[in-house]
């Protein structure tokens, strides 16, 4: 599949629904009447104070399965600890409307980062989460923008961590977080600070599929390098990726790693392991990659460094 889809530049929109569409949100909820009661003057004040002191506006990178994720990882790795203090700074009285709009977008970005951090904790301890919890613990004065914030956070959990946010009680707005495609590779995370790795595993399985179910090792590393994952280099989420692919996932039977018959010097290749065959299917992996390829990390690309900041503060 093509990895060279190009993303348009994102433009601010006054309409909330249109704004959500511009952000590429999927499955966002409609705001309730109670949420819409927040006055525009109160919102404006909170938005200006929360978002003041933001860095330069984000750029619109190219989209695509591997290239989209590479944008997330690259920007995440550039996290600036100073960004966490933005909410305490006061805006200048001479800020023009365009700058105020940008600062508001940055304020929403910070809320998305906070919500991702909150959802990660719920996923690790295997607890459900309700809309009421999210509003009280994270969203707070931004209740009218819950659909945008929740939609973007859910997308982040799915694309970066391979974790689906599923509604289990529509009446009570209750959700559970589960590993994508029925995989159990993240079942032992516990209440620590380990990051879910299912998304990376799914991409590796997908690369194997594109090579007639048997991918040379160098092809795997070339594909992962587009995402900022390099052999022998410690990764912020996955640790040392070579160990993860050639030892951990091999021992768990998600991957098979073997020498190419007759190769001299020795070359190695990856295949699906028995557990991958048991827990998921070719069709599910292909559909997941199609979903990744449709994502466009536009408008809030620097969100991902903010989420890392939330994680670092929690350590």
UniProtKB/Swiss-Prot annotation:
It comes from the Eukaryota. PANTHER family: MELANOMA-ASSOCIATED ANTIGEN 9, MELANOMA-ASSOCIATED ANTIGEN MAGE ANTIGEN. PROSITE patterns: MAGE. One of its GO terms (cellular component) is nucleus. This is Melanoma-associated antigen 9. One of its GO terms (biological process) is negative regulation of transcription by RNA polymerase II. Residues 108-307 form the MAGE domain. Keywords: Tumor antigen. Residues 1-13 have a biased composition (Basic and acidic residues). It holds the Pfam family MAGE. Residues 50-67 have a biased composition (Low complexity). Gene3D superfamilies: MAGE homology domain, winged helix WH1 motif, MAGE homology domain, winged helix WH2 motif.
